[in-house]
A protein has these predicted regions:
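Single conserved hydrophobic/aromatic residue that forms the stacking wall/gate
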Residues: 1-15
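ATP-binding N-terminal substructure of ATP-dependent carboxylate-amine bond-forming enzymes
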Residues: 9, 17-160, 169-176
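ATP-dependent carboxylate activation and anion-phosphoryl transfer catalytic cores
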Residues: 9, 20-21, 27, 46, ...
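A short, flexible beta-alpha/helix-coil linker loop
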Residues: 36-39, 141-142, 191-194, 321-325
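Internal, active-site/partner-interface "lid" segment
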Residues: 133-136, 166-171, 175, 355, ...
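Conserved anion/nucleotide-ligand pocket segment
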Residues: 182-190
Length: 370
């Protein structure tokens, strides 16, 4: 019997690679790396990109990797079939796509820069021009997950509560909205990594400074002005979904520090220690609804806020990609989220992947049996 921490490992894949169903209409896959290490985007994406390359090569695909940072594991010569150390921009990527002619692009394992580049390539018509299919996440799903307006619309349709908020495209608009909501307010720029350019503001002067910075940092010049939920509990779920809409929760993460401390700076525990079973069940039901509506294949990180006084739950945001939390969850549980996500993007389902004592991955539960 293969122990849990070897799920999807080389041993597992080697045992089954000959009879595993996978997509045969794609042969060459382009993976976008995460680029330089900056605050909020570090080695977790090198880890996930390397895992993806390993998994897809084991399944027989040819891998073309593009990354601007040579000081990574994923740019080692043996990780991909072809590796380009090039700037991560649309012009250079078009040249690489024209030369290599990949069948598919896997964007959700290279962090925020991978997702943003995929969106830009799509808008520029390059993916259509060279007939490149996006796997793992649909392009419109990136927008539903990352664009604050689209995400709010999607949540309203699902009947899932969010913090009261409105979108601003200028500092003046943001000032008006903040006056209506009452200070303090949170500013969240769209299409940024780790909340870059945003923050908590307590008065009009702070708002002017932070909002101007946020509008500049946002790929689409859009900032969400949101009611403050300072002091609530911040809770995260790592969900994995396949093409047949089977979903499993890999990990329940409780941030020890309350909302207001960035998740990247907060202590956290997996599994949750002080949250009731009933509350965890509600979180899981809502997370499944969200992941199904966004239709990501592979790992998604869903962040919630819970008011311990009123028991109100609201969704903060989702990351339709491997994230800092998924690297953390992988290490805490022994479940290789990035590796499994890559296999699912290649057309396998959770039922196809063997998993120790559970038999197959669709029966996995995060029982925290250490």
């Amino acid at each position: 019997e293969i122990p849990l921490r070897l799920v999807g490992s080389e041993m597992c894949i080697r045992d089954r690679e000959n009879n595993m169903p996978k997509r045969t209409d794609i042969h060459k896959v382009l993976i976008i790396g995460s680029g330089p290490i900056i605050i909020g985007q570090a080695c977790e994406f090198d880890y996930s990109g390397t895992q993806a390359c390993k998994a897809l090569r084991k399944l027989g695909y040819e891998i073309v990797l593009v990354n601007s940072n040579p000081a990574t594991i994923m740019t080692d010569p043996e990780t991909a079939d072809v590796t380009y150390i090039e700037p991560l921009n649309v012009e250079r990527l078009e040249q690489i796509i024209a030369k290599e002619r990949p069948d598919a692009l896997l964007p959700n394992l290279g962090g925020q820069s991978g997702l943003n580049l995929c969106s830009e390539l799509n808008k520029a018509g390059i993916l259509e021009k060279y007939n490149v299919e996006v796997i793992g996440v649909q392009v419109d799903a990136i927008e539903r997950g990352e664009d604050r307006v689209e995400f709010k619309k999607a949540m309203d349709e699902l009947g899932i509560e969010m913090a009261r908020s409105e979108v601003a495209y200028s500092v003046d608009e943001a000032l008006k909205i903040a006056d209506e909501l009452g200070y303090p307010v949170v500013l969240r720029p769209a299409y940024t990594m780790g909340g870059a350019g945003g923050g908590l503001v307590y008065n009009r002067e702070e708002l002017k400074t932070v909002c101007a910075r946020g509008l500049q940092a946002s790929l689409v010049g859009q900032v969400l002005v949101e009611e403050s939920i300072l002091g609530w509990e911040e809770l995260e779920l790592e969900i994995v979904r396949d093409a047949d809409n089977n979903m499993i929760t890999v990990c329940f993460i409780e941030n020890i520090d309350p909302l207001g401390v960035h998740t990247g700076d907060s202590f956290c525990s997996a599994p949750m220690l002080t949250i009731s079973e009933e509350c965890q069940k509600r979180l899981q039901e809502q997370a499944y609804k969200i992941v199904e509506s966004v239709q990501v294949i592979g790992g998604t990180n869903v962040q919630f806020a819970h008011d311990p006084v009123t028991d109100r739950i609201i969704v903060i945001e989702i990351n339709p990609r491997t994230s800092r939390s998924s690297a953390l969850a992988s290490k805490a549980t022994g479940f290789p989220i990035a590796l499994v996500s890559a296999m699912l993007a290649a057309g396998l389902t959770l039922k196809d992947i063997p998993c120790g004592k559970y038999g197959t991955l669709d029966k996995y539960v995060p029982d925290g049996d250490y």
